[in-house]
């Protein structure tokens, strides 16, 4: 429920921001068709699949009824871009994805022959600064008074930033030495540096609105908290695909 609420809140904030930008643009008499665009706002939604390659994830999938695919989640995000050159943008980006999955131990039950149950959740919120390079011209200047956008504008990009992550397991667990069942919460959260590469295309739907499709891969890891003592760094990397809308200004 908390993950769904946070996703909805982030989507609402991004949508409201773009709505304000669109309203302000409608009141501006200097339409971009008379000049090349100076930037853009965008919102998107899609699916994020963490790599889940570190030993903490392997321990989880080996012992609990969770598969690597269960760490995938709906992804929502947005960005604001500033044009540096005709084919180069500086982009500030934020996104969020999170999952929560109930599970039980695969090979053990409690003294009453009941499953030993717990819930695993994993949330990621990267904030990055990127350079986005367009593989073709985004449009062309006609005379001194008009700039006409091209129908499709493919691009690639790369960036760096920081990711806030939260990995939690809450419920009943087994003591390795005594086989006793006990309730507990194990949690690791914090900030970690990340890098990413991306590629996509913008498909113009009007003079300043467009459909945007994108794929990205984020790379990063974090040292686990003392709750997960003995494990190596937590893998924060993953692949995401998305589609959304953007507004040029």
Feature locations, PLM:
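Predominantly the C-terminal beta-signal and adjacent terminal strand-loop region
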Residues: 99-103, 115, 197, 203-249
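Cleavable N-terminal export/targeting peptides
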Residues: 1-37
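Residues that define the transmembrane beta-barrel architecture of outer-membrane proteins
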Residues: 37-39, 70-76, 121-127, 152, ...
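Strand-connecting loop/turn motifs
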Residues: 36-40, 47, 83-87, 149-153, ...
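Transmembrane beta-barrel strands of outer-membrane/channel proteins
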Residues: 43-49, 92-96, 156-162, 201, ...
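Short glycine/proline- and aromatic-enriched beta-strand/turn motifs that initiate or cap beta-hairpins
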Residues: 24-82, 165-167, 242-249
């Amino acid at each position: 429920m908390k993950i769904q609420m946070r996703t909805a809140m982030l989507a609402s904030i991004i949508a409201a921001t773009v709505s304000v930008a669109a309203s302000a643009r409608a009141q501006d008499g200097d339409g971009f068709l008379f000049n090349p665009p100076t930037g853009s706002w965008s919102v998107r939604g899609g699916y994020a699949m963490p790599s889940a390659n570190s030993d903490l994830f392997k321990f989880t999938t080996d012992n609990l009824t969770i598969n690597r695919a269960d760490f995938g989640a709906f992804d929502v995000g947005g960005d604001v871009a500033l044009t540096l050159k005709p084919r180069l943008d500086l982009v500030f980006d934020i996104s969020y994805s999170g999952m929560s999955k109930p599970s039980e131990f695969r090979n053990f039950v409690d003294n009453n022959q009941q499953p030993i149950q717990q819930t695993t959740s994993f949330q990621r919120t990267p904030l990055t600064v990127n350079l986005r390079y367009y593989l073709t011209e985004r449009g062309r200047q006609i005379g001194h008074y008009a700039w006409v956008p091209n129908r499709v504008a493919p691009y690639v990009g790369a960036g760096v930033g920081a990711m806030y992550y939260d990995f939690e397991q809450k419920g009943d667990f087994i003591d390795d030495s005594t086989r006793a069942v006990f309730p507990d919460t194990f949690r690791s959260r914090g900030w970690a540096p990340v890098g990413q590469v991306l590629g996509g295309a913008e498909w113009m739907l009007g003079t300043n609105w467009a459909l945007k499709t994108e794929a990205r891969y984020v790379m990063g890891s974090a040292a686990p908290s003392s709750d997960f003592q003995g494990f190596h760094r937590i893998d924060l990397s993953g692949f995401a695909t998305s589609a959304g809308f953007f507004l040029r200004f």
